[in-house]
Design a protein with these regions (language model features):
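Conserved ABC transporter NBD signature motif
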Residues: 74-85, 91-92
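Catalytic Walker B motif of ABC-type/P-loop ATPase nucleotide-binding domains
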Residues: 174-178
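Conserved ABC ATPase signature
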Residues: 149-153
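Conserved ABC ATPase "signature" region
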Residues: 116, 120, 127-145, 193
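ABC transporter nucleotide-binding domain
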Residues: 193-288
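Helix-to-loop junction immediately C-terminal to a conserved catalytic motif
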Residues: 66
């Protein structure tokens, strides 16, 4: 259910507003800023992708935003409340959901009973609780497991139960920390589609993942953090424009692929100033180039001269993964 936004004094209200956030660890002689003066605002009813390599500060930031850790400095407003003043977080946490990578389970309870317990804790009772539990079991394809004890579930099944039970309560903001880890492709797509529908109904989502396809599909804004600092923050479209000087050429060859062909692409990667990177997967070679036409024509000629059958050629704009890797590379080299 969307919240009412307070626009006092014509000042825009955000679902999350973080200002000059710092988290420091260590003693006086060896202090380290794990979070180093970051600021960002997240609009209501959007998906905010929070990306970064391992150790960049993502988990620490989520722990601060969800009240597990106290910041060293900075201010945070969630749902228009300063969460570190006047006991505001106790009110705010009733309106947020959190799906972490390490869920806890009542191992001796069945899936349905444990779901009903969570519904009861969120204030649902009687038939309303049972109906909502069964609806979510159906949505996340858990109905056949309703009488199975949690301890007998696979990792992926437990993950689906964890996600389903979080949607038992009405929330305005959902923190998703790599929610698709352990899910098979069908369950993963089912979850992403359900999240998208909830966002259309007004839910705001703070989303971390290492799977860039999920970012492409869901996110309205992307924030990239590295070494505790924000290095990029914009819409996917504008980030692609910024890093869009390169194209990716995918050349798929008819197998088998001879050693001569691998040698050709290896030399191309080493000798051409127009090539940033070449990767191959089985019989497909992916060339990242700032001048695709200059690379493509001689490559196609070489393949035809050597009687190599080409199954497909595609030239693609940079992906979010390309943006992410290039932003990190530029930041690490600066």
């Amino acid at each position: 259910m969307p919240v009412e936004i307070n626009n006092n004094n014509d000042q825009k209200s955000y679902c999350i507003s973080v200002k000059n956030l710092v988290k420091t660890y260590g003693s006086a002689n060896s202090k380290k800023n794990v979070i180093d003066d970051i600021s960002f605002d997240i609009d209501y009813g959007t998906v905010f992708g929070f990306l970064g390599p391992n150790g960049a500060g993502k988990t620490t930031t989520i722990k601060i935003l969800t009240g597990i850790l106290q910041p060293t400095k900075g201010s945070i407003k969630i749902l228009d409340k300063d969460i570190f003043k006047n006991n505001n977080f106790n009110e705010v946490k009733k309106r947020i959901g959190v799906i972490t990578q390490n869920p806890s389970f009542e191992s001796n309870l069945t899936v349905e009973r444990s779901m009903e317990l969570y519904g009861f804790l969120w204030g649902l009772g009687g038939n309303k609780n049972k109906d909502k539990v069964r609806k979510l079991l159906d949505i996340f394809e858990l109905t056949s497991l309703r009488d199975t004890r949690n301890e007998d579930l696979s990792i992926g099944q437990r993950r689906r139960v964890q996600i389903a039970r979080e949607f038992l309560h009405e929330m305005d903001l959902l923190f998703l920390d790599e929610p698709t880890v352990g899910l098979d492709p069908r369950a993963r797509r089912n979850l992403l589609n359900y999240i998208k529908k909830q966002v259309e109904l007004g839910l705001t989502v703070f989303f971390t993942t290492h799977i860039m396809e999920e970012v492409e599909y869901l996110c309205d804004q992307i924030c990239i953090i590295n070494k505790g600092k924000i290095i990029e923050f914009n819409t996917p479209h504008l980030l692609k424009q910024k890093y869009g000087s390169t194209k990716k050429i995918d050349i798929t060859l008819h197998p088998p692929v001879s050693k001569n062909i691998y040698d050709y692409f290896q030399k191309l990667s080493s000798n051409s100033i127009d090539v940033e990177n070449i990767e191959n997967s089985e019989n497909t070679f992916s060339i990242t180039s700032n001048n695709p036409q200059h690379i493509l024509l001689p490559t196609v000629n070489y393949l035809y001269q050597n009687k190599i059958q080409i199954e497909n050629i595609a030239i693609n704009d940079p992906s979010i993964e390309d943006v992410f890797l290039k932003a990190l590379k530029n930041n690490n080299e600066s």
